[in-house]
Regions:
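Left-handed beta-helix
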Residues: 1-10, 200-203, 209-423
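A structural signal for short hydrophobic beta-strand segments in well-ordered beta-sheet cores
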Residues: 35, 165-167, 227, 238
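Conserved beta-loop-beta/alpha segment of the NTase-like Rossmann-fold superfamily
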Residues: 70-169, 196, 206
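A recurrent flexible, glycine/aromatic-enriched loop bordering the glycosyltransferase active site
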Residues: 158, 181-194
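Alpha-helix/helix-capping structural signal
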Residues: 19, 67, 136, 199-200, ...
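N-terminal glycine-rich phosphate-binding loop and ensuing alpha1 helix
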Residues: 2-81
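Well-ordered alpha-helical segments embedded in enzymatic catalytic cores
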Residues: 43-47, 107-111, 225-226
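Short, flexible, basic/aromatic active-site loop/helix in glycosyltransferases
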Residues: 167-185
Length: 423
């Protein structure tokens, strides 16, 4: 991915990653939401690739707390491996927020600007969504409007879940209406969490009203605090994003994002690449000698109807799938072993999972290093938006429906868990 980098190579991108991401638990019980795997990669990696493709080479993670920092640093380090793996040259440089506790996403940006002496315009993106952004077009919009801050706006159907913008004819944001009803929403354009910001925001952080806001609320968040404050002063414009934007902040949103990418040809091309020529709408990853050998074995099984890969299916590297198994509209990550006559539908299976014979997994997420015990005479069911955390052992014949299981737990054989959180 050796592309022209001027003038964007000097621009810094800040990615606040704070909080405990409770809405995604148990997937985030022991790791940052930014590295939760989707399409067989850490979630935030797609943001880095999208921006690096356009010439960005400097990223800073505003990681709050040990779990967020450890998760991000252990995977990305300072960017050398990420750059090599994705063939990005010149390489990407990744920095981290020092151990200075912030009180919100905007406060994290304040800390990063001060610590890394940021004196130029910069971009802020989030670690829990997938997006396509024409950054040069956004910069052109900012230059035309002379906006102090530009907020990326994206169309949404479920306006009740987002902050929705009310703008004037010039694009200036009058206000955001938080989670309005469909009837009262001023528009369908929601805050994407993508911000292009003037370095002059340094002076805003020092204003008495902003300091009082922090003292009173114990918080300085973009959506709740800083953007409303700036919008009241006419300093914020809304940029209508032309590319896709997908929220991945809850298990339901996660599976919805998987479905929407798998079903949309343009999104599939961006996130999955080209499908196999022999199997329409099937992607099997891996380019090493052993990966190719296993890929070819799976293709032969599918072509001879020994396994069924229906709808749109993504399979990771070094997977083993036994006869009679059906995978439909789902993702299976690297190093997974699926037994005989397994059924996986509209689900996401993360890496290094073992699933026993006859198991049925529907509309659910199975975390990393999970063993689903199951047999043809005592099958296990995982259904109804169940979410299984990492390193869980599920006994044969168990039933999980709308259940959540924390990491490292054991679910007994023939257990019946309906709508419960196994903590």
């Amino acid at each position: 991915m050796s592309l022209p980098t001027e003038p964007l190579s000097g621009m810094m991108v800040m990615i606040p990653v704070g909080g405990e991401a409770r809405r995604l638990r148990p997937l985030t019980a022991e790791s940052s939401k930014a590295v939760v795997r989707i399409f067989n990669r850490p979630l935030v990696e797609f943001a880095l690739i999208e921006l690096a493709r356009q010439g960005i080479r400097n990223f800073v993670f505003g990681a709050k707390g040990y779990v967020n920092y450890r998760s991000l640093f252990d995977y990305f380090r300072e960017g050398e491996g990420f750059s090599a793996q994705n063939k990005i040259w010149p390489r990407v440089h990744i920095k981290y927020q020092p151990r200075i506790e912030d009180v919100g996403s905007a406060d994290s940006v304040r800390i990063l600007m001060d610590y890394y002496n940021v004196r130029d315009q910069f971009l802020v993106v989030q670690g829990d969504n997938l997006f396509e952004l024409d950054l040069r077009d956004m910069l052109t919009f900012q230059e035309r409007t002379k906006a102090f801050m530009v907020v990326g706006l994206t169309p949404v159907e479920d306006v009740e879940s987002y902050g929705v913008a009310e703008t004037d004819e010039s694009g200036r944001i009058r206000r955001f209406v938080e989670k309005p009803s469909r009837e009262t929403a001023p528009s369908r354009m929601a805050n994407s969490g993508i911000y292009l910001i003037s370095p002059e925001i340094r002076s805003v952080f020092e204003e008495p009203e902003v300091r009082a806001m922090i003292a009173q609320n114990g918080r300085l968040d973009f959506g709740l605090d800083l953007i409303p404050y700036l919008a009241e002063r006419g300093m914020v414009y809304g940029y209508y994003m032309k590319g896709s934007w997908l929220d991945v902040g809850t298990p339901r949103a996660y599976l919805s994002a998987v479905t929407r990418v798998l079903e949309d040809p343009s999104r599939r091309a961006a996130y999955l690449g080209e499908p196999l020529p022999q199997l329409r709408n099937v992607w099997i990853q891996g380019g090493s000698v052993d990966s190719v050998r296993r890929k070819e074995a799976l293709v032969r099984k599918a072509l001879s109807n020994r396994i069924s890969l229906d709808g749109h299916v993504l399979i990771g590297r070094h997977c083993q799938i036994e006869d009679g198994t059906i995978i439909r509209d789902s993702c299976v990550d690297n190093f997974c072993i699926l037994g005989r006559e397994v059924t996986i539908e509209r689900s996401a299976i993360m890496d290094r999972v073992v699933i026993g014979d006859g198991a049925i997994i529907q509309d659910s997420i199975v975390g990393r290093h999970v063993r689903v015990g199951s047999s043809l005479d005592s099958p296990t069911w995982v259904t109804g938006l169940s979410v299984v955390g990492d390193d869980v052992e599920i006994g044969r014949g168990a039933t999980l429906a709308a259940a959540k299981v924390n990491p490292h737990r054991t679910v007994a054989e023939k257990a019946d868990i309906q709508g419960q959180f196994v903590e």
